[in-house]
Amino acid sequence: MKLQKLAGSVLLASLALGMVAPQALAAGEELVGKGTVTFLEDKTITTPTDPEEPGKEVVVDPGEGTTQTEQGPLSVDFVSVLKFGERTLTPSANAGVYEAKPTTVKKDGVDTERGNFVQVTDKRTGAAKLGWKLSAAMTKKFTSATTQDEIAAATISFANPFLNSTQADKGDIHADATVLLESDGSSAPVANAAAGKGWGTYTVEYGTSTDANMDKSVVLTVPASTPLSVDEEYTADITWTIANLD
């Protein structure tokens, strides 16, 4: 009986508390303010960042890389110049295999070597986040500036990709393990982001300073018996393209 009485007392106390009416405010004691915000499109050009320290800006000399000069919501921001150097021609039945030197960037004013890399940015938002695909093509064969001789069947291969970003979804972005560029100008896939992914800035570096493979990850191959001019610099065009994911 005591237990029933105690339970009843608790119930009555709860009901009593629930019946307390809020205190009415006097005139002038309350005022509702507003908060507003407007988001604008970022129309700045994204500058190169350190592929091994995302978000850290670096300075790259023109001889080391090509930097974007036009703004767009979906952009290729930077690509390394592939420097295969001066090579001595020797008679051989084997193809010539030449590795590209690393890219030198200035980080905090200090020359620092990084693997050759490409940087892209997607600033699209909302329904416009359609995903993207990055590709590359040798759109001009290696050609001598003086004689206009072409290396007809040379290839460039990329290996050991390291994809990096400050974005949390960087693990969802795919970078192809190997990329092979043929002299016929055909396009090769490099990386891609699914719809709803890939917002922000991403780098793909080929070889890293910690893995000691920066000077082994981008390779030019020239078929044996290819006629070549000595004391001539050959230059090729590598076009990197970012587009909506199909």
Regions found by a protein language model. Name each.
Residues 2-4, 10, 19-246:
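Signature of Gram-negative chaperone-usher
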